[in-house]
Amino acid sequence: MNGVSSAEFAVDMGFSIKRLIFLEKVAVESLVALGGLNADERETLISWTGEALGEVRMSFRGETFVTRALRNPGIRGCPICLREDAMSIEGPSTAAMVMRGDWQLRNVNLCVQHEHPLVELWKVNYPVERYDFGERLKEIADHILVGAFDRPSQTPTAYDLWLDKRLGTGIDTTWLKDQTLF
């Protein structure tokens, strides 16, 4: 985004970041067009973001959750994932850092790939500032790169592995397949 905040970028592109955060159709379609996303990619983006279903429920990865299971002032993530993202390119470390959708869900407590607990990266009450990932990541990038957020590894439990698979693929061959996640 060439050094501008998400809010400034959104305005430059003709929509507000607040409208995008709340997945208003015009803002989403503008972002989809800017990113050159096809219909399947659009649906994947929305499913990993979480879409409001009324006042207190959200659809996330084909499941229905209470909003608070996904939307909180504290933003969590795996510092190892973010560090690997940063190391994957030359240039500003934050240019490649990607926030993962599953990190939003309060039931997800571990990055299964790295066996690392999710840690709170920042806590901001105002959603427009909270979800300006570019700005927030700039504030903590050096800490991520030097391992300040790193914690001891943890072996994933059967629950961690099951939840990761169900969210990632929608496949559940257990007796829980007909049960909702929340």
How should each PLM-predicted stretch be described?
Residues 89-93, 121-124:
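A short secondary-structure junction signal
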